């Protein structure tokens, strides 16, 4: 009926081929997983970059608005402008280096907004209130983007440090 004579060499070759195929498939799956996670990290960093750019774009408007009402706060406005220029000059740096300069910009912007309390006319200005709202919204979006980035990096680090991937 059936010829059950197996060639032992053919069986060994078939088993080796299956093992090689399984290993190759495993390597491809692992590589794709790493590539997807690395892409997610890059995309999440771009989300942070978008919000940082938005914050950078709001600073000149804030400086102009505050300067109209408070001629005596020029040192604070100069500090904010310098912090913005410094942060913008480090766009291509690593996230850690850039974060340091962005934190300085955030602190300078918060100082200007806090100092505005001393100027009731400025505080009541619709333009200033809108800028405050936009800055607060940007900071919230930046916080969410940072959390998303941190989660993506954490997942990538776990993939790198565990076996099997």
Predicted regions and their residues:
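A helix-centric hydrophobic-segment signal that preferentially recognizes long
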Residues: 2-165
